[in-house]
Amino acid sequence: MTVTDTLVENSRRYEEGFDKGDLPLPPGKKIAILACMDARLNPYGLLGLEEGDAHVIRNAGGVVDDDAIRSLSISQNLLGTEEIVLVHHTDCGMLTFTDEEFAGKLEAEAGERPSWSAHAFTSPEDDVRSGIEKIRSSPFIPHTTTCGASSMTCMRGS
């Protein structure tokens, strides 16, 4: 049995016991979280959230790119969120390469460069500041939106 097979089976069991179907579509706390996709990071646990509380949007690095703005815009303009929190962390994989290195690797393996940027960064703090500025300057995010940031320290085991 593959990991995917196991996950599909887990999904079936979860659906059978799912009891949150009556939760409203808009998140109860009217907040959207943009977080890194790092498997060690649990935004719900980190921020004390439960299902139905928030929209949790994840990507590599938790960067504010066009797709993040798209999701945040839908969350804000159609589903009533009023606050956005960016979650970055130490020991992030996005700190381990440059955009040029990654594009070169993909070109070597796939025969062409991607049309998009990986948005690697050298400082989580600077990327959070940049992300907040991108959100605040976007015409697609209401200017009444409150932005904040959270960070988590990841410690590697010895």
Language-model features: where?
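Short glycine/serine/threonine-biased micro-segments
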Residues: 46, 50, 59, 91, ...
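Conserved beta-strand-loop surface patch within small alpha/beta domains used
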Residues: 13, 17-70
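Short beta-strand segments
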Residues: 34-36, 58, 87-89, 150-153
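Divalent-metal-activated hydrolytic enzyme cores
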Residues: 1-27, 62-67, 74, 78-79, ...
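Ordered, amphipathic secondary-structure segments that act as subunit-interaction surfaces
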Residues: 78-89
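Gly/Ser/Thr-rich loops at beta-strand to alpha-helix junctions
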Residues: 37-40, 90-94
